[in-house]
Curated annotation (Swiss-Prot):
Principal location listed in the UniProt entry: plastid
Transit peptide feature, positions: 1-87
Subcellular location(s) per record: Plastid, Chloroplast; Mitochondrion
One term under GO cellular component: plastid
Modified positions (N-acetylserine) in chain numbering: 88
One Pfam family here: BolA
Protein's name according to its UniProt entry: Protein BOLA4, chloroplastic/mitochondrial
Keywords for this protein: Acetylation, Chloroplast, Mitochondrion, Plastid, Transit peptide
Statement: the UniProt record of this protein carries the keyword Plastid: yes
Top-level taxon of origin: Eukaryota
Keyword Plastid: yes
Species of provenance: Arabidopsis thaliana
Subunit structure of this chain's protein: Interacts in vitro with GRXS14, GRXS15, GRXS16 and GRXS17, but not with GRXC5. Interacts in vivo only with GRXS14, GRXS15 and GRXS16.
């Protein structure tokens, strides 16, 4: 079982690890295992391993060489060899899909609740956070929680796909307006 780096009260502590991972970390086979004088490794509270240089050295090139490396639990890793990619989402710039989304939400609420007035406002600029104001006679005799449930039920499909959260919701009856 490989031993791991541990945080101690001393700032420059190198606890043992496997010889192969140290070799890969410092990229030098000429230095013996116990004689790392300049660069040391310490373990920080955020579970990141960072290189600590002695006072003589000014650049981390002796640690990483020309390669961009990061230390993982299994030794050093060349991060350029990893394939990073992102997946584009359905949401484009503000105003492209959002207006049709807001209008479809307003239409669904009006149809299902026979609402007199419905306003759906984009709060975040990308359609993920919305503010909803509804005036409907269907809210007569309903508690505030049940009124919100009725609105959520009407726009459930949008809440599952594009809309992340309803930041504010106002539900009133015509007599309360």
């Amino acid at each position: 079982m490989a031993q791991t780096l541990m945080a101690t009260t001393r700032p420059y502590v190198l606890l043992s690890s496997t010889r192969a991972s140290l070799y890969r970390l410092f990229q030098s086979s000429k230095r013996p295992f116990a004689s790392f004088s300049a660069p040391l490794v310490r373990f920080t509270n955020s579970r990141c391993v960072s290189a600590v240089l002695s006072r003589k050295e000014t650049a981390p090139s002796s640690i990483y060489g020309n390669r961009v490396s990061r230390v993982s639990g299994f030794g050093a890793l060349d991060i350029r060899s990893l394939n990073f990619s992102t997946k584009s989402s359905q949401i484009n710039d503000a105003g492209s899909i959002d207006q049709t989304l807001m209008q479809s939400m307003e239409l669904k609420i009006k149809e299902q609740l026979n609402a007199e007035s419905v306003t759906v406002t984009d709060m975040s600029g990308d359609g993920r956070h919305v503010c909803i104001n509804v005036v409907s006679s269907a809210f007569e005799g309903q508690s505030a929680v049940n009124r919100q449930r009725m609105v959520y039920k009407a726009i459930w499909e949008e809440l599952q796909n594009v809309v992340h959260a309803v930041d504010q919701m106002t539900t009133k009856t015509p007599s309360e307006v």
